[in-house]
Amino acid sequence: MNLGDPDFVDVSKVISDMLSTNFAQGLKKKINDNKTFDPNYYGGRWDQINDHGTSHLSIIDSERNVVSLTSTINSYFGALMLSPSTGIVLNNEMDDFSIPMKSSSNLTVPPPAPANFIRPGKRPLSSMTPTIVLKDGKVKASVGASGGLYIIAGTTEVFLNYFFLKMDPLSSVLAPRIYHQLIPNIVSYEN
């Protein structure tokens, strides 16, 4: 997908596709119960950045005030720098930008995504997905996750467990998870 900072990259087509029933039905038709294909079969063109060092918290108080907060230093010990005035470890979120490189002869790894190349003032893509769910203007849930590339799938699975499988909040979070991102072409099972 050609996702990037919308102040620098036109993401209207990607967003339109992500919200399109026809696009989703087209992807669904490509799913084969017996085989996973290369990423380009599903429309994947670019490599994904793997990040670490993330925490998430979700809070809803007795008055229905809500917070969904994801924080990251990205890699272990972030930028390896500590602020002398605050003692806070600084993040290295700059590592989430795609880095231009020469063409690779390795056909199993897609090239970096140009929409996520670094530019002054630009924000890198991130898998952080702090989410507040509302219905008719009222808070129904607060959800998010940590785990780098597992964040989006984890957040989605907790959401589905709670709203569609009718699990309680703790069971929704503790339930085993399945993860597949096409590269590497391996299914991960977490329990």
Curated annotation (Swiss-Prot):
Could you cite one Gene Ontology molecular function of this protein? glutathione hydrolase activity
User: Which Pfam family, giving just one, matches this sequence?
Assistant: G_glu_transpept
Which superkingdom does the taxonomy of this entry point to? Answer: Eukaryota
Q: Could you say which tissues express the protein in this record?
A: Expressed at low levels in embryo, roots and leaves. In mature plants, expression is restricted to vascular tissues of roots, leaves, flowers and siliques.
GO biological process, alphabetically ordered: glutathione catabolic process
Active site (catalytic residues)? 54 (nucleophile)
- The UniProt record gives the binding positions of L-glutamate as 72, 74, 93, 96, 126-127, 147-148
Phenotype on disruption: Mutant plants (Ds insertion) display reduced inflorescence height, silique number and seed yield.
Give the PANTHER family listed for this entry.
GAMMA GLUTAMYL TRANSPEPTIDASE, GLUTATHIONE HYDROLASE 1-RELATED
Give the record's family classification: Belongs to the gamma-glutamyltransferase family.
Q: What is this protein called?
A: Putative inactive glutathione hydrolase 4
Q: Which organism is it from?
A: Arabidopsis thaliana (Mouse-ear cress)
The organism's lineage is: Eukaryota, Viridiplantae, Streptophyta, Embryophyta, Tracheophyta
